Regions:
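Serine-hydrolase-like catalytic core of hydrolytic proteins
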Residues: 1-163, 215-222, 226-236, 352-353
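Substrate-access "cap/lid" subdomains that shape
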Residues: 128, 133, 137-243, 260-264, ...
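Short glycine/proline-rich turn/loop motifs
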Residues: 1, 68-73, 251-259, 320-330
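Short Gly/aromatic-enriched secondary-structure transition segments
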Residues: 238-251, 362-365
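Mobile gating loops/cap/lid regions near enzyme active sites that modulate substrate access
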Residues: 234, 278-371
């Protein structure tokens, strides 16, 4: 059950971490959901498997959507949800040692919007002391680097107009109805897939023109591990009604779909992720890269967006009904490959990761590989 009572975090640690004298590395998870859904405490995001590897785990929940990310004249500033995340990280710095964690070894990791949040925290003003490493899984950097300001202004003006029509306080349900209207309005804009989210050029974030410089500065302070799934764009290509109408054409429909998934995957995710990795290395920073390229036999989504998450968080019970895992082999692969992926993520958090580039697949054997 999700609701707007969302300003909290959860700490997961072993008894040994809580009672032993040695402080453990900390991993902080930021969830995805396009900044409109999700929460750190969902069962599917349980970090027990990682905590069992000698880590103290923290899951953050924060304001989303209209409540957290839309600047509205005279009513709400931008980036409130980002400030929620910053406050949570400040709490971790001040308190995690009492729970067995080392505040000087904090690794952020997140997927999709969560990865985008981490990218924003990397370039935000005055946040670099709050964490030391970052894992960006499927960050939508192609959308992030679009100029979203025109859309933000239009949505903010519409929200202001709707709210100004009455002086009566609005219920959360009424605000969520307004949010749905704003999401529909956002579809008119090129960056409408991220209608809400941190806004560049609004405190504490730099304008778009300064992002490259901020990344160079971050490279001197924060170790990076970035990656993507091979077919990130599969669900997003299907969201476009016009495109989807071509996918059922006889003989060529499947080819059109494959081509569109290839294009969307690269424009929204892969090109931006690879560019960030390369820019980091050129700036003298430490960056590692992975590609997740497994999918179950009965899933036409193939190696889709979010598919790596069940291998890191939650249990088979939490993920069994997910369409992206349809296939008789999924449970066995989830348990075997998931063990290796958790080991890899934990090794990065501990500063013990040796691989530079990792292909995560089911049965192929090329490059530096986990299978």
């Amino acid at each position: 059950m999700q609701d707007e009572d969302c300003l909290h975090l959860t700490v997961t640690a072993s008894v040994e971490a809580l009672t032993g004298g040695k402080k453990r590395p900390v991993m902080v998870f930021l969830h995805g959901g396009a900044y409109v859904s999700g929460g750190g405490d969902l069962d599917a995001y349980s970090p027990v498997g990682l905590a069992q590897r000698g880590l103290v785990m923290v899951n953050i929940t924060h304001r989303l959507g209209l409540f957290g990310y839309l600047p509205i004249h005279d009513r709400a500033p931008a980036n409130l949800g980002l400030y929620d995340q910053i406050m949570a990280l400040e709490w971790i710095q001040g308190n995690i040692a009492d729970l067995g964690g080392d505040p000087n070894r904090v690794t952020l990791f997140g997927e999709s919007a969560g990865a985008d949040s981490i990218f924003c925290l990397m370039i935000a003003e005055g946040t670099q002391h709050l964490f030391h490493q970052a894992i960006l899984q499927s960050a939508p950097l192609g959308v992030r680097m679009m100029d979203r300001e025109q859309m933000i202004q239009a949505l903010g003006a519409l929200a202001h107009h709707r709210l100004a029509s009455s002086e009566a306080p609005r219920t959360s349900d009424e605000m969520l109805s307004l949010q749905v209207e704003l999401l529909m309005e956002a579809k008119k804009h090129p960056s409408g897939l991220m209608a809400f989210g941190p806004s560049l050029g609004h405190a504490p974030l730099p304008p778009l023109s300064e992002v490259s410089h901020k990344v160079q500065l971050a490279a001197k302070q924060i170790n990076l591990f970035v990656g993507y799934t091979t077919h990130e764009g599969a669900p997003f290509a299907r969201m476009n009604d016009t495109l989807r109408s071509y996918f059922d054409l006889p003989l060529i429909g499947w080819l059109i779909e494959r081509l569109m998934v290839w294009i969307v995957s690269r424009k929204m995710f892969i090109w931006g992720i690879v560019q960030l990795h390369s820019r980091y290395l050129r700036a003298g920073g430490s960056s590692r890269k992975y590609r997740f390229d497994w999918w179950p036999s009965q899933s036409d989504l193939r190696s889709t967006h979010c598919l790596e998450l069940p291998f890191l968080l939650g249990t088979w019970t939490d993920w069994a009904k997910a369409p992206m895992l349809h296939g008789p082999e999924s449970r066995v692969v989830l348990e075997s490959l998931g063990t290796k992926m958790k080991d890899l993520w934990a090794a990065f958090a501990k500063g013990l990761m040796k691989l530079e580039n990792v292909n995560i697949v089911g049965d192929e054997t090329y490059g530096e590989i986990i299978s």
